[in-house]
Amino acid sequence: LDTLAPPLKRRLASMLYESMLLFGVLFIAAWLFSTLLQQRHALYLRHAQQLWLVLVTGAYFVWFWTHGGQTLAMKTWHIRLVDKNGAAVPAWRAILRYLLAWLWFLPGLGLAAALGAATWMLMLIPALNLLLWAVAIYLDPQRQFLHDRLAGTRLVMTKPVPRQPAAAATPR
């Protein structure tokens, strides 16, 4: 295990891949919710469904972070989550990290709502929030996100496992 923090570009690529994987997980979770509760209209139990999807997302991340420190996207991009000492992340710390990670979105969305932002401003304010949050790693001496610093976790690079050459067929 290396202690080098992954570059921002690698983290953002991992997040993009993670969002595609999470789309499938949340699609199934939403389908289960609407099927089991016989949801016939999109607004029926809307807030309960939103809470359900936030909980499913949290369960997804917390499970992977506490069982090896990597989601599939993190494995693909050779990134691992560890605590500040390099050890495995306990469940309470993974939950804290998940909740703090919402700071990527909530301040920008809250500000946009408070300002009564419409159309393009509704997208611009949260996008600026995301940009500021991402580039803030350059203010951290260990190049960690703010939510990692607050949760006592770190993202580190892992060395890719070398592929073994296919065993040569031996003549008999």
Regions found by a protein language model. Give the residues of each.
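A structural micro-motif at secondary-structure boundaries
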Residues: 82-94
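Juxtamembrane cytosolic face of transmembrane helices
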Residues: 2-15, 19, 60-74, 88, ...
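Hydrophobic, lipid-facing residues on alpha-helical transmembrane segments of integral membrane proteins
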Residues: 12-28, 32, 47, 51, ...
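Hydrophobic alpha-helical transmembrane segments
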Residues: 1-5, 40-51, 67-79
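Membrane-helix interface segments in multi-pass membrane proteins
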Residues: 26-54, 108-130, 138
